């Protein structure tokens, strides 16, 4: 019974991993990856409520995570962005809206299933306005 369950889980993990789109090779130019948030951070850019959302700048503490590590981030957007989601195939984070065009998040990485480790995933940062229109930016996120 245990062998069948393990085989089913392993097969499902392989199928899910195979379904993931091409992982980007690097972060876009408006991303900063460093241990501390950049001192000169842009304010939210003014935008009409019905204008398309726009991600101006993204800061992440790292693009390599492991169980027990933390992941911090800040996203500067246009002022019409209602929500920012940070997502991979393994997890999803809803960022805190701290000011017009400003979003932050902090999360501690919990234990990862063995099949999810030692893999590079696509990290999606999704900004949405109130109409649900989205802008997505992607970077590689390595799980150890």
Identify what each model region corresponds to.
Residues 125-127:
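Conserved structural position at the C-terminal beta-strand
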Residues 20-22:
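Bacterial signal peptide processing site
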Residues 24-71, 76:
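Short, compositionally biased P/S/T/A/G/V-rich stretches that sit at domain boundaries
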Residues 99-110:
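Aromatic sugar-binding surface patches on proteins
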Residues 111-119:
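Surface-exposed, short loops/turns at beta-strand junctions within beta-sandwich domains
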Residues 76-82:
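Short proline/glycine-enriched turn/loop motifs at strand-loop junctions of beta-rich domains
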Residues 133-142:
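Edge beta-strands of extracellular beta-sandwich domains
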């Amino acid at each position: 019974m245990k062998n069948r369950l393990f085989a089913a889980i392993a097969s499902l993990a392989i199928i899910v991993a195979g379904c993931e789109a091409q992982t980007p090779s690097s972060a876009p130019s408006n991303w900063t990856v460093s241990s501390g948030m950049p001192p000169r951070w842009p304010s939210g850019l003014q935008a009409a409520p019905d204008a398309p959302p726009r991600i101006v700048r993204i800061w992440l503490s790292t693009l390599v995570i492991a169980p027990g590590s933390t992941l911090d981030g800040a996203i500067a957007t246009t002022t019409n962005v209602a929500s920012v989601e940070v997502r991979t195939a393994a997890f999803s984070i809803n960022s805190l809206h701290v000011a017009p065009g400003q979003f932050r998040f902090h999360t501690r990485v919990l234990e990862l299933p063995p099949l999810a480790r030692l893999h590079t995933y696509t990290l999606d940062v999704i900004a949405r306005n109130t109409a649900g229109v989205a802008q997505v930016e992607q970077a590689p996120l390595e799980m150890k």
